Amino acid sequence: MAAAAAARHIPIAHISGGDVTLGAADEYYRHCISKMAAVHFPSCADSAARLVRMGEAPGTVFCVGGLGDENIRTMPKMGRRELCDSTGFPLMQPFALVTYHPETAPDAGSPAAQVQALCAAMATVDGVFWLITGSNADAGGEVCTRIMQDFAAAHPDRAGFVQSLGLRRYLSAMEYAALVAGNSSSGVVETPTFRVPTVNIGRRQAGRTVCANVLCCDADRAAIEAALRKALSKAFAPVAASARSPYNGGNTSEKICTVLQNFDFAKPKIFYDGPVPEFDPQRSVLV
């Protein structure tokens, strides 16, 4: 769609450009869209600066924060008992929210082996109920989902599987979770707002700006187990509680609308080769 729009000289506004995800094929498409876009709405200062280093003019780059962060702060959450009743799982006790997707980069390892390592690590960690959601539609997703379903079926007193929680239930679960684990972007981009201890596994999100509440580890059983135990430790709790989300831009959607209403889309796109200014998602946008 972006290529067709560019060929027809239809302006493109790109949200979350400048991000890096070395373990996902999205990496290629994201940067291609950025080069075709007329205006950019990166989610954090690092991504905004990266766009300028890619040749995008600072006057076209508006660091507005993440829409996911805004959703967390504005969407009414479910009560914990309501969430418990909705899923049918014992979520009044400490629980961990787990989501794992296949890595899709050319050098990605076996998704099945990675999920098996995750399940083996979860089996050794007591004290939490594992609330597991299904994998996405990327190649290997069905295998990942089946392995996680089998784990939940084999440990019905310690784990439960839901294919999809939906946005409201997912954010509600994240709010009450003692731990978030896996390799979803939500574990990096959204958990800092909740300040929940998080384990980011493997390379799928490698390159993203990571906050203090997130521990990154390799996708092998020993590394995952060590990270899970550290994230659940009393020593890590104050570290996670100190997290300050780099994706908090305040009224992100309002900022985007303001720019779109006032931006000069008739101005020709240039390749910028100058200094990189400082960006802050908390600032008001100036067009």
PLM feature spans:
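A donor-sugar binding/catalytic signature common to diverse glycosyltransferases
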Residues: 1-2, 40, 166-212
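C-terminal amphipathic helix plus adjacent low-complexity
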Residues: 233-287
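Active-site and donor-binding regions of nucleotide-sugar-utilizing enzymes
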Residues: 1-58
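A nucleotide-sugar donor-handling region in carbohydrate enzymes
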Residues: 36-113, 268
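Donor-nucleotide binding loops and adjacent catalytic segments primarily
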Residues: 78-176
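Short acidic-hydrophobic, aromatic-tinged amphipathic segments that line or gate anion-handling sites
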Residues: 42, 62-64, 161-163, 215-220
